[in-house]
């Protein structure tokens, strides 16, 4: 008689967590940060059709890493949730906290009840109305439904530690848009590079958008083309190109003739 296969609940949760983390680690990184006029999204995304950054509602934005089909389902569900709440009550009742809580409940349920968890990590950002003293809000929601109210910036994706370190060293309050883009792009260039080296992250591989608090209704807008080229700092020159060629210490002299 064969014994039935048994795995403890702890082992099952551990395996699901490992699966989700590996899937997220394969994704390219995203940086979300607050700046003087609202919230900035900067994502590594060479695709012009499949977006990792999107609008959710009037003052809400969305960013995600992981499996595209899974976070796209979450994005669409969030838009429907926000539209229904705004239609049933009032547009001002649609807040980042309520939407982040809805995402957390959905991901938590999927993680515990479904055979496979979602391999995603998402960020919901919110800015206040024009003239409101309310500070921008950033909510990070992970694959198991955990939710964290982040301060200043969020880093998601594969190689997060060097990017987060660069952000902590460079970030400061009251950044303007150009400075915020420069800090985020330079931080992304640290991901996956060796010690003291920077990757080449050019404009064509970036997806950039902002939640602009000064806009009267829909705060979300994308930045692309020439406008983005003016904001992105130049890529660092390769060491081989910048270093001068070494010169010989002594000049070679012809050998003396033999007698």
From Swiss-Prot:
The formation of the proteasomal ATPase ARC-20S proteasome complex, likely via the docking of the C-termini of ARC into the intersubunit pockets in the alpha-rings, may trigger opening of the gate for substrate entry. Interconversion between the open-gate and close-gate conformations leads to a dynamic regulation of the 20S proteasome proteolysis activity. GO terms for molecular function: threonine-type endopeptidase activity. CDD domains: Ntn_hydrolase. Pathway: Protein degradation; proteasomal Pup-dependent pathway. Residues 233-243 have a biased composition (Low complexity). InterPro entries: Ntn_hydrolases_N, Proteasome_alpha, Proteasome_alpha-type, Proteasome_asu_bac, Proteasome_sua/b. One of its GO terms (biological process) is modification-dependent protein catabolic process. Keywords: Cytoplasm, Proteasome. GO terms for cellular component: cytoplasm; proteasome core complex, alpha-subunit complex. The keyword S-adenosyl-L-methionine does not apply. Residues 244-259 have a biased composition (Basic and acidic residues). SUPFAM superfamilies: N-terminal nucleophile aminohydrolases (Ntn hydrolases). Pfam families: Proteasome (PF00227). Residues 233-259 are annotated as: Disordered. It is found in: Cytoplasm. The 20S proteasome core is composed of 14 alpha and 14 beta subunits that assemble into four stacked heptameric rings, resulting in a barrel-shaped structure. The two inner rings, each composed of seven catalytic beta subunits, are sandwiched by two outer rings, each composed of seven alpha subunits. The catalytic chamber with the active sites is on the inside of the barrel. Has a gated structure, the ends of the cylinder being occluded by the N-termini of the alpha-subunits. Is capped by the proteasome-associated ATPase, ARC. Component of the proteasome core, a large protease complex with broad specificity involved in protein degradation. NCBIfam families: 20S_bact_alpha. Belongs to the peptidase T1A family. This is Proteasome subunit alpha. The gene is prcA.
């Amino acid at each position: 008689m064969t014994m039935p296969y048994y795995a403890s609940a702890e082992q099952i949760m551990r395996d699901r967590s490992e699966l989700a983390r590996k899937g997220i680690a394969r994704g390219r990184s995203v940086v979300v940060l607050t700046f003087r006029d609202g919230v900035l999204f900067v994502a590594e995304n060479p695709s012009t059709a499949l977006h990792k950054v999107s609008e959710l509602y009037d003052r809400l934005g969305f960013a995600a890493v992981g499996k595209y089909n899974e976070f796209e389902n979450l994005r669409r569900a969030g838009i429907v949730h926000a539209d229904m709440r705004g239609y049933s009550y009032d547009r001002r009742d649609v807040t980042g906290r309520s939407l982040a809580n809805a995402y957390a409940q959905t991901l938590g349920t999927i993680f515990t009840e479904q055979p496979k968890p979602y391999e995603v990590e998402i960020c919901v950002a919110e800015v206040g109305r024009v003239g409101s003293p309310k500070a921008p809000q950033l909510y990070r929601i992970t694959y198991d439904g955990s939710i964290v109210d982040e301060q200043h910036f969020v880093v998601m994706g594969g190689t997060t530690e060097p990017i987060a370190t660069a952000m902590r060293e460079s970030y400061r309050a009251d950044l303007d848009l150009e400075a915020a883009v420069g800090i985020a792009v330079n931080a992304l260039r640290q991901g996956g590079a060796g010690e003291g080296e920077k990757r080449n992250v050019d404009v064509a591989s970036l997806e950039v958008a902002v939640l602009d608090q000064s806009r009267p209704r829909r705060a979300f807008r994308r930045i692309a083309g020439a406008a983005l080229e003016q904001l992105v700092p130049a890529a660092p020159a390769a060491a081989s190109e910048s270093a001068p060629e070494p010169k010989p210490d002594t000049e070679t002299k012809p050998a003396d003739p033999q007698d």
